[in-house]
Structure formats: C-alpha cells, structure tokens
Design a protein with these regions (language model features):
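Conserved, function-defining micro-sites of small-solute handling proteins
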Residues: 1-161
Length: 161
C-alpha cells in the first residue's frame, strides 16, 4: 500500500519523486532514517514508534482524521494534499462457496472479538481503527478500494514486475 500511497500523492499534488521500492515498512523506515531515502509512507506501527522517539518526522497521516497515537501529525489533507486517503486495512476472507451459516458465525465472532475492550486497546495502541462491518458492507468497500487503486495504478503507469 505504501507504494500506491506515494503514487496517489504524486497524482494529487505537484510533488514528483523517484520511486524506490522497498520490501516492507521496516526497510523503508530504515532507509529514511539513514538518509538513503528522503520520504516514505509507512504503516502506523513502524511510523509511530519512530516518530515518538524523534527518529522520523511525521509529515502527514493518509486518513480522514489525525491518528490518536500521533495527534501532532496532520492529515495529508491538512498538509495540503487534498483527497489523499490511503488506508492500510486488513480483510477477513473465505472461499466463495462457504455456506452462509458459516459466514454469519465468522462475522458474529469477529465483531465480538473486535468489541472486546482489551483487543480494542491493543489495536488502538498500534494505531489501528478496527471496523466490524457486515460482509455486504465489506464487499462494497473492497470493490471501491479495488477500483480506486486500479485507477491509481493506471494513471501513474504502475506496472507489476
């Protein structure tokens, strides 16, 4: 997602950068801290830990609202990049032929787990904002995200290799 977040920023702003692909947030974060790279979009657990100890400077959070774990960092929109939302999310998937009763049970158990106070706190400490949407809502969200990032890939000329 970090690669696409950078491409989206370039599409929405006058900023143009040379893309340096890293294999994960940890190597990308190290590259920025060492001066090998100038900027990177990082996942919240990596970024917030380094921002807190002043090894990285947070320039913008790619979300609609500021992150509670690093409230001093503005959103990308507040930083001047209008419409820059690039959420890192995880989905829970099952094979298409899974019986509805099993899907419903998995959904109930997932929502229950995400409602647990300890689970919510641990996720919040990592900068996560858990959402227990319905299977239909998640399917709509997934389709929307696929369309959005497919468009970013096309407009930016991104190629898989």
């Amino acid at each position: 997602m970090s690669h696409f977040a950078m491409e989206l920023m370039q599409l929405l702003s006058v900023v143009k950068l040379t893309h340096l692909p890293y294999k994960g947030a940890a190597p990308a974060g190290i590259a920025v801290m060492s001066g090998e790279a100038h900027v990177s979009f990082l996942v919240m657990p990596v970024a917030q830990a380094q921002i807190r100890v002043n090894r990285l400077r947070g320039l913008g959070v790619a979300a609609k609202t500021r992150a509670p774990v690093i409230p001093q960092v503005p959103t990308m929109e507040e930083a001047g990049v209008k419409g820059h939302i690039a959420l890192q999310w995880n989905g829970f998937f099952a094979p298409a032929a899974t019986p509805r009763a099993i899907i419903d049970k998995l959904h109930r158990e997932t929502v229950a787990a995400l409602s647990n106070t300890d689970v919510k706190q641990r996720l919040a400490d990592e900068g996560a904002d858990p959402v227990g949407s319905s299977p239909a809502e998640f399917a709509a969200f997934f389709r929307s995200e696929a369309a959005k990032w497919g468009d970013v890939a096309k407009r930016s000329g991104t190629k898989l290799d």
